[in-house]
Amino acid sequence: VKIGAWLATESVSLLSSLVDSLLDAGSSLINLFAIYHALQPADREHRFGHGKAEALAGLAQAAFIAGSGVFVMLEAIDRLFNPKAIDNGEFGIGVMVFAILLTSILVLFQAYVVRKTGSIAIHADSFHYRVDVLVNIAVIMSLMLSSYGGFLLADPLFAGAIVIYMGFGSWKIAIKSLDDLMDKEFPDEERIKIREIAMAHPKVHDIHDMRTRRSGRYSFIQIHLEMSRELTLVEAHQI
């Protein structure tokens, strides 16, 4: 539908929405594979499981978003210096309203899934569709200003703003994915909570060498516990 709307209007802001939607479809397929792989149980060669497949998918999505953003930005710059009137603006606006309704339903469902699972891949995918909603709103404003207000520069300016937002989202997804891949430690407040839980045991005198990391939706915590030397090895192991 968006392809038809773009061909009818030749709007560069609508092109940005079209590219974003195509990117969303490709990213969702990547996520399907990544989540399936991440849910596979640990095996002999992957003792900590396969959770990092989600982070790899998130990193790939960040690259796709950045690449599509560069393409649209080049088109927007060309249209900025070569303004063009928008044709069939009403058709384009109708398509965008329809797209907003469908995408909003999907975003609400994905937000629910992310709260339940903490999936990086679905979080990245959800960002794509949230961007899609904002992009569609911006496209509607652009088409209205260009078609009815005679402000031809609205089209490339709105497209440029959309690309900047896409770039910011791409950066955030990339950082989150890299943190997971590089085994970044938990935030200080979470480490403090872990220490409090460990120290609450009456036979634990102190802890040291705490190490934490995440792999997909799984969290791993390693701690050295200091206990009385009078405890037997069996008792210490049970603690």
Task: Give residue spans per PLM region.
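Alpha-helical transmembrane segments and adjacent TM-loop junctions that form the membrane-embedded core
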Residues: V1, L7-V19, L23-I239
